[in-house]
From Swiss-Prot:
One of its GO terms (cellular component) is viral nucleocapsid. A motif (Unconventional nuclear localization signal) lies at residues 1-18. Belongs to the influenza viruses nucleoprotein family. This is Nucleoprotein. Late in virus-infected cells, may be cleaved from a 56-kDa protein to a 53-kDa protein by a cellular caspase. This cleavage might be a marker for the onset of apoptosis in infected cells or have a specific function in virus host interaction.
């Protein structure tokens, strides 16, 4: 991308920092995850969790959600202004699982939000450490991406369920900042914009007055974020049209859906970061590892290293397969829900199955599930190789718009070519070519028709041995190209319900 120089790296977004050199970035990301680790250790002490209980991913998620809730200012303000019976707006809580007499028992804990904020700040040198909070949100978002399909949400906004590979980050909260925006897929941004436009169509005051001005600024900012994800001039020009519209309506919705479809071939640039559960950072800090001094990166070898020697447990329901549960969490840890399964399998060193073949439900356990029958097992989160995370859509060369990988949003910068049925995708474009964006539409469709499935993306990029931390010897894997490796295709995964 030509504008690369004007962009901050992921890590700078992640840590809210201004321009820094590589070492400063590694140190500030290290400071961020070290703070998460220190916070987690302190919470385990507060809740009197044993070592094994502290390594339980369900407990980690509860603790993460509690601190996120404590810092959710908008919602806290809302709760205080709209008190509901039997609910203390100043407290937050969730299920903590403890081992009693060879069984897991659930205990609901309630915690003072003020107290949680104090513990969090104390672990982060007295700062609010928003970057660490965003990091936890992205981990939760990656877990949702690997666990649920968003078919219903896609259909509701008039999009096609086949666009599920564009939906990365669709459950991220609004307050997730620049780091959150970087990991949102094209479909997620389109969906947010369509929802906004629909509100404007139904509510006359949406764009009016002082509030409307703020709404308009938010709308244009979202348009610019989406524009920045596209890599061809025509797609960007169409985004300018959508952004500049006097009062956005159905024409804009049509344009956005068209753009989302086009992103199946002319892929957007979406960032990928390996965000791990808080307990993993906690374990490392507890063992004496100094993240800030050693430095850390979310897109290099570090997360793989960390997972190589972390033991994390999960509660397993009676008919779930522990290996499948491990795969789900592995994918979430590396933000690989939309990666080609062949690439993931090669890196992981064991076969990664499509969602529909996994005997596992989500990681979290509902309050009405019976704990009597639950077991726990160790999650296998290790990998055979590591690879650099990418933010390109896997387009072969930026000079001429060429195909990215369809139904896949690459996570790892690893050479592969892209088996796709252009006919199936082009069938989605039998829409109306009229309207004021017709010339751009024609141009986009032409680029899509000219894209060659046999093109290789990430040429010469490979995976690395775990001993090769400087990434000196790339191993370029060869894949069986007969089947396209999409995780959600032909699937019956549960829907994500808020």
């Amino acid at each position: 991308m030509a504008s690369q120089g004007t962009k901050r790296s992921y890590e700078q977004m992640e840590t809210g920092g201004e321009r820094q050199n590589a070492n400063e970035i590694r140190a500030s990301v290290g400071r961020m995850v070290g703070g998460i680790g220190r916070f987690y250790i302190q919470m385990c002490t507060e809740l009197k969790l044993s070592d094994n209980e502290g390594r339980l991913i369900q407990n980690s998620i509860t603790i993460e959600r509690m601190v996120l809730s404590a810092f959710d200012e908008r919602r806290n303000k809302y709760l205080e202004e709209h008190p509901s019976t039997g609910r203390d707006p100043k407290k937050t809580g969730g299920p903590i699982y403890r081992r009693r007499d060879g069984k897991w028992v659930r205990e609901l804990v309630l915690y003072d939000k003020e107290e949680l904020r104090r513990i969090w700040r104390q672990a982060n040198n007295g700062e609010d450490a928003t970057a660490g909070l965003t990091h936890l949100m992205i981990w939760h978002s990656n877990l949702n991406d690997a666990t649920y399909q968003r078919t219903r949400a896609l259909v509701r906004t008039g999009m096609d369920p086949r666009m599920c590979s564009l939906m990365q980050g669709s459950t991220l909260p609004r307050r997730s900042g620049a780091a959150g925006a970087a990991v949102k897929g094209v479909g997620t941004m389109v969906m947010e914009l369509i929802r906004m436009i629909k509100r404007g169509v139904n509510d006359r005051n949406f764009w009016r007055g002082e509030n409307g001005r703020r709404t308009r600024i938010a709308y244009e900012r979202m348009c610019n974020i989406l524009k920045g994800k596209f890599q061809t001039a025509a797609q960007r020009a169409m985004m300018d049209q959508v952004r500049e519209s006097r009062n956005p309506g159905n024409a804009e919705i049509e344009d956005l859906i068209f753009l989302a479809r086009s992103a199946l071939i002319l892929r957007g640039a979406v960032a990928h970061k390996s965000c791990l559960p808080a307990c993993v950072y906690g374990l490392a800090v507890a063992s004496g590892y100094d993240f800030e001094r050693e430095g850390y990166s979310l897109v290099g070898i570090d997360p793989f290293r960390l997972l190589q020697n972390s033991q994390v447990f999960s509660i397993i329901r009676p008919n779930e397969n522990p290996a499948h549960k491990s795969q789900l969490v592995w994918m979430a840890c590396h933000s690989a829900a939309f990666e080609d399964l062949r690439v993931s399998s090669f890196i992981r060193g064991t076969r990664v199955l499509p969602r529909g073949q996994l005997s596992t439900r989500g990681v979290q356990i509902a309050s009405n599930e019976n704990m009597e029958t639950m077991n726990s097992s160790t999650l296998e989160l290790r990998s055979r190789y590591w690879a650099i995370r990418t933010r390109s859509g896997g387009n072969t060369n930026q000079q001429r718009a060429s195909a990215g990988q369809v139904s896949v949003q690459p996570t790892f910068s690893v050479q592969r070519n892209l088996p796709f049925e252009r006919a199936t995708i082009m069938a989605a474009f039998t829409g109306n070519p009229e309207g004021r964006t017709s010339d751009m539409r024609t141009e986009i469709i032409r680029m899509m028709e000219n894209s060659r499935p046999e093109d290789v993306s990430f040429q010469g990029r490979g995976v690395f041995e775990l001993s090769d931390e400087k990434a000196t010897n790339p191993i370029v894997p060869s894949f069986d190209m007969s089947n396209e490796g999409s995780y959600f295709f032909g699937d019956n995964a549960e829907e994500y319900d808020n």
